[in-house]
Amino acid sequence: MIALVIQPSSEADLEEPILEVEGLSVVRSGKLVIQDIDLTILKGEFVGIVGPNGSGKTTLLLSILGILNADSGQIKIYGSKPMSKNLDGKISWVSQAASNLPSDLRLTVRELVELGTLNRSNMFSRRRDKQQVDQAIEMVGLKDVENTDIGRLSGGQRQRAVIGRALASKAEFILLDEPLVGMDSESRSSLLKLLDDLCHDADKTILMVSHDLAAIRQTAHRMIYLEETIKFDGDTSIFPDLTELAELRGIKPVHDEVHGHHHHSHKGAGEDL
């Protein structure tokens, strides 16, 4: 009965599971890529996923989005299956291709962000859309370049514009796949601050995959180490250092700089996974 549907209080909201994954296994091209994944993400969490190349990080994201089918197990987002109609506008994906948009793309920042407002239910309410777009552009710090073509922006600015599109959609759950790729350290820091602000001030829930261990440590509340299955899931403050990670993987580390203050963006610096 409809009368029994009660809006939870904001206090209960804090414990509301946004994502529930149980016993998820996915086979791609005949190979088991992820197996027996159990994962629950609560409203307002910022969760980082790290792991070596080919460990199943992107596969997990694509499964959550419903782009890849599970071979076993189940996924629920806001209590619904991936791709359900009632998830329209609630979930948004920022892929690593965002910063590689073609340089001759004839689309301004504002036009790209506006795409986020289009869905089945709001095709005719342009006034509200404009307000959403203005707010999203402001939040990602691109007001000065809102009428500039995407192709003329730096990789970091492009990535911000794509996140702006996600914000304009009013999505509450944002998934990011390697959003820091190709960014200089200044762009990376400002993007991480933006994501942190979105969690704290805008009540978003974020799931981010990255090779950049130091960046995830700096921003995420909770970290997951994935290598086919989840080998660590806990508070960022107790995430293993590289020596302990090597033990998880059964390999010897080259060297460990995670607890130092070095923050290299290139591979082989001891910080990238």
Locate the predicted segments by residue:
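Catalytic Walker B motif of ABC-type/P-loop ATPase nucleotide-binding domains
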Residues: 174-178
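ABC ATPase nucleotide-binding domains
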Residues: 237-273
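Conserved ABC transporter NBD signature motif
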Residues: 73-87
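Conserved ABC ATPase "signature" region
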Residues: 114, 127-145
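H-loop/switch region of ABC-family ATPase nucleotide-binding domains
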Residues: 210-211
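H-loop (His-switch) and adjacent beta-strand-loop-beta switch element
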Residues: 223-235
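Helix-to-loop junction immediately C-terminal to a conserved catalytic motif
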Residues: 65
